[in-house]
């Protein structure tokens, strides 16, 4: 079994694949750039995670808070702001429809949304970045199983 972080990314990717605006163009990597033929698209990845030993448990457990990012990308046309808002709306509704991610985590909350525009390539690109704070728990030393 994989680390709970990977399980969370996989769950999020499954949740955002097939949205109305981006369809099957959902990816789990930010390493490779998206060419204009793959836009509009969304990607999901995780950033930082804070872990603390739980003070309220008989066994050693860790309470974890993970920041997961979903980024939407569109070609920057006249209506790119509207399209980015539509992607953000679809992502937010899909992920927050089940704030336990099928029982994998304790809670998910949206903590921020940012938009940006990059006009330095052949095809300008607009982006929206949604940050989700995900709370989950593991037994200390067993990071592959959420409890």
Language model segments and positions:
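Charged, amphipathic alpha-helical segments and their flanking helix caps
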Residues: 1-35, 46-147
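A short glycine-rich, His/Asp/Glu-containing loop-to-beta-strand
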Residues: 40-44
